[in-house]
Amino acid sequence: MIPGEIQVAAGDIELNSGRETVSVSVANHGDRPVQVGSHYHFYEVNDALVFDRAPTLGFRLDIPAGTAVRFEPGQARTVQLVAYAGKREVYGFQGKVMGALEGRA
């Protein structure tokens, strides 16, 4: 082994295996592109993105960490979201939650 070398086991890596997911249709009604990062709380994304927000509470994009999805002006697409895990508490972003996700409607 070389110092710093990473040895990966054979096979595929499944991201977010067994986690709750939801698909949502999103349209950018703004005049500028909107980019959403992999771990951004989708419920709180830019208001120029038009979609049914209620089902997205506690969800983020189901994409690899460190990546993003870009919505060009006038563009519509369907994205898959995955539920947050762990303590399921959300702080920051636009400040719409600021605490536990459980018990919210």
Swiss-Prot record:
InterPro entries with a match to the protein in the record: Urease_beta-like (IPR002019), Urease_betasu_sf (IPR036461), Urease_subunit (IPR050069)
Stretches assigned to coiled coil: none
Location in the cell: Cytoplasm
A single cellular component GO annotation: urease complex
Enzyme Commission number: 3.5.1.5
Alphabetized UniProt keyword annotations: Cytoplasm, Hydrolase
Pathway of action: Nitrogen metabolism; urea degradation; CO(2) and NH(3) from urea (urease route): step 1/1
Reactions the enzyme catalyzes: urea + 2 H2O + H(+) = hydrogencarbonate + 2 NH4(+)
CDD domains named in the record: Urease_beta
Alphabetical list of Pfam families matching this protein: Urease_beta (PF00699)
GO BP term, example: urea catabolic process
PANTHER family cross-referenced by the UniProt entry: UREASE (PTHR33569:SF1)
HAMAP family (alphabetical): Urease_beta (MF_01954)
Oligomer and partners: Heterotrimer of UreA (gamma), UreB (beta) and UreC (alpha) subunits. Three heterotrimers associate to form the active enzyme.
Entry's family note: Belongs to the urease beta subunit family.
Protein's name according to its UniProt entry: Urease subunit beta
Gene from which the chain derives: ureB
